[in-house]
Amino acid sequence: MRPLVVASFPVKRIEDLRLIENFLDSDLIELRLDYLKDISIISNYYEFLDKYKSKLIITLRDKEEGGINQIRDEIKVKLLKELYDKGFLYDVEASFLKRNDLPYDNKIVSAHYFKYLPSRKEVEEIVREFSEKAYSVKIAIPSLRGYKEILLPLLENEKITIIPMSNNPLERIAVGLLGSKLVYSYAVEPLAQGQIYYKNLIKILNYINDMITSSGVT
């Protein structure tokens, strides 16, 4: 069984939401709402988004978390609570959850490290703390010396999503084959290094999955 392919889509203008229809052949579509100048406007479009709910991941990432525009904590808390009440899947940073009382059951809890490698103990503690209730715990770390030794043991957990922040797209494919729950790709333009166009990623993973299935390899 292959991992779920996430097509990440930057919503730069609210009108871009109409383009969701173009990416419904992906398993999931990540709406990167932090590209919007005024993120609070999304409250007016919950009814529109509702028909795509089963396909969507809503991401509100501020600059400290690798986002594009700064989002005030109080606005983010308000929107996440609204999204929770309406049953949307969202992605929230573990550090934000530790500062704010927010529900995360059946949601994606992330930890992004951009400039240094965390210890294996640190990431294991995050997985242990959040994995029981979360839909997935996502760990993203840079491709510095020793990063594979930190990421690969995490794949024993069926809820884990790992992202090697490497320029080599093969690494994203590899972790998906090794057990990452989600593999992130791009819908229109790469939003992170190493991302592959989602249609190509689906073809690659389906081909490998079919080859394994037909050969009887388990």
What are these regions (language model features)?
Residues 35-49, 93-106, 118-122, 143-156, ...:
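Active-site-adjacent beta->alpha loops and helix N-cap segments on the catalytic face
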Residues 152-218:
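C-terminal alpha-helical cap/extension of soluble enzyme domains
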Residues 25-27, 73-92, 127-138, 174-196:
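Structural recognition of alpha->loop->beta junctions
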Residues 19-25, 40-56, 81-85, 98-107, ...:
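Acidic (Asp/Glu)-rich catalytic clusters
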Residues 8-10, 28-38, 59, 80, ...:
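Catalytic beta/alpha-barrel core
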Residues 9-24, 72-82, 118-129:
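Short, acidic/polar
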Residues 1-67:
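Conserved N-terminal beta1-alpha1 strand-loop-helix module at the mouth
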